[in-house]
């Protein structure tokens, strides 16, 4: 394993590294915990290693053994970002490099785990059964299981997961045996195995009332019974995308490629969990127009999952490459040679938006392609920068060496680093080594400026604008009408708009948003103010308020809020309280907040009332955006737990450990099963939990914050948002 300095992990893979983990998990919806054991196979990397250190967050540790014997261990003082290091002392310091050990840990998760969202029946489509799903990226896997939670450590895993008999369990792996029903008939156990090494952030679990539809021999679409057919229709091109990706990147190594369409609180557009991509239901447009997200997630099967950024500072190697692959897949599948340039232009625009927002919040340093993340939560640095600035770098290299040569290089790059990790310097060296005959074309390529300069790239790309011009031309027609203070346009071209692809419609609306944002837009055009009658005429022509396309709906809402057209506010509230996709929720909450007055108050109150609906990651980020301090106390369990029910006992070796470890700096120690489980039971019985149920969906007419009547409020000015994190334009995690 290549050495690395991972600032986001407290583990020690440079001394002792995990290679495989066997998981036994028991999912308890009543208490909202997973009781589990993790048996690690580890390898000594450095002679004389004395400890195996893992990352944990909000986990209760029960017992620890090394090669079957009780081990000394401690959970150190909790770091506010990185959690608590689990320090397991090895029985001797005489280990040599290459030796292998087995380390077994019993533990249980917390209802406050940031990796797990527990949904009550009311938050599911069916409304009758609870649901859970996990999200490990970037550094949340440590709240699902003790792990070396850094991308540089790649492991294989197997798992046996016990769930209620009515439920189906899915994981980021291949099913290794048929489900087994318990003798009492109240539970089933599902078995999984992942043979391709992967980082811990890709360990994923979903449990719910699920059905599947086959798309091909290696692709299924999973979702709740009432949604699965819609999802199967919208994602019916999955096999076609996968075949196109293989032509560009090489053989698909993961066996199956299934898709799970999750409940609406899933915080991202998609997550590339191996063998089982998670996606948001906001992609279900009914016309397959948002299926490009599937192409993005499929691309990650090579760039991100097979070849992985070594640390989060080099995240662009995951996402920039994936944008490049996605755009090539979609160009091939659509048969439109202009798709690549058109989509790249939209990505460049989202990069400009991200840079502007980071600059306004005083966090421009996070727009470096290789940022310094020391002391920074990787979630706070998340934006379109690694996606689109990373893509821009690759696209510029492609321009210099030629398209065919770069396509061949992409395959060689993936082959060279498959099942491994890579950083920016290694990528640079590998690229230059493959093009010794292109010295002239690459001589003035400033690698350091690309990697370490904040802001936009110094080299502005040139793209074919043909597909853009139609959309922007119609937008300019409406803008000219606004400048002329008329209430409609002579020719709204309704039929043309309806025939456009989703990205073209978004381009039209985004152009109008840009024109209404400042004194001049990104192209220097003078800004305009859109009157209420003009917006109503636009809505009548294109049915924008009623659209089922989430991307179009989002842009329309932004445009109306920028124009202070408060008729849209109830619709915005309905949107942000009906789904938790951060690409949409965060900007719309910020837009409401920026309006000031009643809009700001309503944004804050709505979020507070609905906070438990959102995934913990989304909840945390929106709270930062709105400067809200949420009580993150645990929820009260429906029934109590005992040490025995957790599979833990008060053994003498566990209890004596606290003394044998000496004077550790730990304040939050777990001296074994007794102290760990007892602390957990105290936490569970503290009564501090917030109820996770929600009431209704925020309803169209009155809006989720309460059906107060709206009045025009004076604009209090632009509020500088505290959080630096920005949404991804239209890329996968958005």
Predicted regions and their residues:
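Short, glycine- and charge-enriched coil/turn segments that flank and shape catalytic ligand pockets
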Residues: 46-48, 94-98, 179-187, 286, ...
């Amino acid at each position: 394993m290549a050495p690395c300095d991972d600032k986001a992990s407290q583990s020690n893979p440079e001394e002792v590294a995990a290679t495989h983990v066997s998981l036994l998990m028991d999912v308890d919806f009543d208490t909202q915990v997973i009781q589990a054991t993790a048996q690690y196979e580890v390898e000594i990397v450095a002679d004389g290693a004395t400890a195996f250190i893992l990352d944990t967050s909000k986990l209760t540790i029960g017992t620890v053994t090394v090669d079957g014997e009780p081990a000394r261990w401690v959970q150190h003082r909790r770091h506010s970002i990185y959690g608590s290091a689990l320090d397991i002392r090895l029985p001797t310091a005489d280990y040599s490099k290459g030796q292998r050990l087995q380390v077994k840990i019993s533990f249980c998760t917390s209802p406050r785990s940031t990796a797990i969202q527990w949904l009550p029946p009311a938050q599911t489509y069916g409304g009758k059964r609870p649901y859970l799903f996990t999200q490990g990226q970037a550094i949340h896997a440590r709240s699902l299981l003790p792990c070396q939670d850094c991308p540089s450590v790649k492991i294989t895993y197997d798992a046996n997961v016990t769930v209620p008999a009515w439920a189906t369990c899915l994981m980021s792996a291949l099913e290794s045996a048929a489900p087994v029903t318990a003798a009492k008939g109240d539970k089933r156990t599902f078995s999984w195995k992942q043979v391709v090494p992967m980082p811990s952030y890709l360990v994923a679990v979903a449990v719910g009332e699920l059905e599947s539809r086959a798309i091909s021999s290696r692709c299924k679409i999973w979702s709740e019974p009432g949604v699965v057919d819609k999802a199967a229709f919208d994602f019916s091109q999955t096999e076609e995308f996968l075949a196109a990706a293989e032509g560009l990147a090489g053989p698909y190594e993961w066996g199956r490629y299934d898709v799970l369409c999750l409940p609406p609180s899933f915080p991202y557009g998609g997550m590339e969990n191996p063998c089982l991509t998670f996606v948001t239901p906001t992609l279900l447009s009914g016309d397959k127009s948002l299926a490009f997200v599937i192409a993005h997630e499929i691309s990650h099967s090579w760039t991100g999952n097979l070849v992985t950024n070594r640390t989060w500072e080099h995240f662009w190697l995951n996402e920039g490459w994936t944008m490049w692959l996605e755009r090539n897949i979609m160009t091939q599948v659509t048969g439109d040679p202009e798709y690549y340039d058109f989509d790249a232009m939209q990505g460049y625009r989202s990069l400009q938006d991200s840079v502007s927002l980071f600059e306004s919040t005083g966090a421009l340093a996070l727009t470096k392609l290789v940022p310094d993340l020391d002391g920074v939560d990787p979630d706070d640095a998340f934006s379109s920068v690694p996606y689109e600035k990373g893509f821009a770098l690759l696209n510029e290299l492609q321009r210099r060496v030629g398209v065919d040569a770069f396509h061949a290089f992409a395959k060689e790059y993936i082959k060279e680093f498959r099942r491994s990790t890579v950083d920016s310097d290694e990528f640079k060296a590998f690229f230059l080594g493959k093009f010794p005959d292109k010295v002239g074309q690459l001589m003035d390529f400033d690698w350091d400026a690309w990697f370490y300069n904040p802001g936009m790239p110094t080299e502005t790309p040139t793209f074919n604008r043909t597909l853009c011009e139609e959309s922007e031309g119609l937008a300019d027609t409406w803008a000219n009408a606004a400048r002329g203070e008329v209430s409609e346009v002579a020719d709204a071209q309704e039929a043309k708009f309806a025939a456009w692809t989703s990205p073209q419609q978004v381009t039209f609306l985004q152009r109008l948003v840009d024109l209404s944002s400042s004194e001049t837009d990104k192209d220097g055009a003078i800004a305009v103010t859109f009157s209420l009658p003009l917006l109503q005429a636009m809505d009548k022509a294109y049915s924008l308020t009623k659209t089922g396309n989430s991307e179009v709906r989002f842009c329309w809402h932004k445009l109306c809020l920028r124009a202070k057209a408060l008729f849209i506010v109830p619709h915005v509230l309905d949107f942000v309280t009906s789904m938790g996709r951060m690409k949409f929720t965060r900007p719309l909450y910020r837009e409401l907040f920026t309006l000031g007055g009643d809009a700001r108050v309503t944004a804050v109150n709505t979020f507070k009332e609905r906070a438990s609906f959102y995934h913990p990651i989304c909840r945390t980020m929106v709270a930062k955006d709105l400067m809200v301090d949420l009580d993150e106390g645990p929820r009260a369990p429906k029934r109590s737990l005992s040490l025995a029910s957790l599979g833990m006992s008060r053994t003498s070796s566990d209890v004596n450990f606290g003394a044998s470890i000496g004077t550790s700096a730990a304040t939050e120690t777990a001296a074994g099963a007794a102290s760990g489980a007892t602390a957990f039971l105290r936490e569970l019985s503290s009564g501090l939990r917030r109820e996770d149920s929600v009431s209704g969906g925020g309803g169209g007419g009155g809006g989720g914050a309460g059906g107060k009547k709206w009045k025009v409020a004076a604009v209090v000015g632009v509020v500088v948002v505290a959080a630096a994190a920005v949404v991804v334009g239209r890329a996968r995690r958005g």
